[in-house]
Amino acid sequence: MLRWTVHLEGGPRRVNHAAVAVGHRVYSFGGYCSGEDYETLRQIDVHIFNAVSLRWTKLPPVKSAIRGQAPVVPYMRYGHSTVLIDDTVLLWGGRNDTEGACNVLYAFDVNTHKWFTPRVSGTVPGARDGHSACVLGKIMYIFGGYEQQADCFSNDIHKLDTSTMTWTLICTKGSPARWRDFHSATMLGSHMYVFGGRADRFGPFHSNNEIYCNRIRVFDTRTEAWLDCPPTPVLPEGRRSHSAFGYNGELYIFGGYNARLNRHFHDLWKFNPVSFTWKKIEPKGKGPCPRRRQCCCIVGDKIVLFGGTSPSPEEGLGDEFDLIDHSDLHILDFSPSLKTLCKLAVIQYNLDQSCLPHDIRWELNAMTTNSNISRPIVSSHG
């Protein structure tokens, strides 16, 4: 029984950020917020959400170990990717408006909170943003995105073998997925499932004739082939900048945006890779408003979803030119316990808590007390 259980405001106000879950903590890296200064080159920021205390913290800026020498830290960016391998977060790609796109690989040690740049070899992917990254074992797969130097969408797959730190451009077999950016790629078993994103009628070149494909594409990492997939009778609308995650061998997507429909989404869909069917899911409780460019991480049996951007309430669900960036966080529980359901009842009906144990009252307070680290809200125009 899926249920939205927590809704808190006041976290980092972020759009097109990237995040990973490490135990009961979620690490969020970079992104942007309308109205902030992005002309000045500065370090990427790191926010940590504790899924037990339901509190956000922000790591302090990194100081250089050598006087007069800048520390090894990625610059502030958006449209990048992060994955977790062992105790290391690998951050790749993304761009900002001053430096453009980047193809330097950065590594962040979650134990020491230190950055470093691993020495890599092989065919390094071109700098880009809006790509996807997912992991199978020790290998990170990068697909798609918008390449800066070529000035076009990509449908290449690169892999980084982290045991040797070697990049390889995969010569794929089969009919490849279309060139795209701001799609999702999710690893289920040895197969990578690609959904959505923004493509163009002119193939790799951007002409503002956008396509929002809603067919799922599957890449087999063992044979390095794109698979021929059967038709599916029920499909979500095509979209970009949505969230996707795998849970119990199935793929879920949430939210996103379709410019051709001029519409933001807040729907939740489940894809079963065995039957190759989609099903719309209706969780209990109050979920997030329609949005795109949010982040989503799995912590145990819970989904932590935060940030993103939505149309201003005065503008309806589709207007591109007046967007509100979010500082909120939502938790979707796949298997809420009786204890959780009881706490939700206490909150919903405003029941007396004075007779409850201290730890329960502490948990209720955490579930209803907003964070306080977000900056004031600013509308985004354009």
Curated annotation (Swiss-Prot):
InterPro entries: Kelch-typ_b-propeller, KLHDC3-like. SUPFAM superfamilies: Kelch motif. Gene3D superfamilies: Kelch-type beta propeller (2.120.10.80). The keyword Cytoplasm applies. Pathway: Protein modification; protein ubiquitination. Keywords: Cytoplasm, Kelch repeat, Meiosis, Repeat, Ubl conjugation pathway. It is found in: Cytoplasm. GO terms for biological process: proteasome-mediated ubiquitin-dependent protein catabolic process; protein ubiquitination; reciprocal meiotic recombination; ubiquitin-dependent protein catabolic process via the C-end degron rule pathway. Its main location: cytoplasm. Kelch repeats lie at residues 25-77, 88-138, 139-189, 191-249, 251-301. GO terms for molecular function: chromatin binding; ubiquitin-like ligase-substrate adaptor activity. GO terms for cellular component: chromatin; Cul2-RING ubiquitin ligase complex; cytoplasm; cytosol; nucleoplasm. Component of a CRL2(KLHDC3) complex, also named ECS(KLHDC3) complex, composed of CUL2, Elongin BC (ELOB and ELOC), RBX1 and substrate-specific adapter KLHDC3. May form oligomers as a KLHDC3-ELOB-ELOC complex; this interaction is likely autoinhibitory for the E3 ligase complex. Substrate-recognition component of a Cul2-RING (CRL2) E3 ubiquitin-protein ligase complex of the DesCEND (destruction via C-end degrons) pathway, which recognizes a C-degron located at the extreme C terminus of target proteins, leading to their ubiquitination and degradation. The C-degron recognized by the DesCEND pathway is usually a motif of less than ten residues and can be present in full-length proteins, truncated proteins or proteolytically cleaved forms. This is Kelch domain-containing protein 3. It comes from Homo sapiens. The gene is KLHDC3.
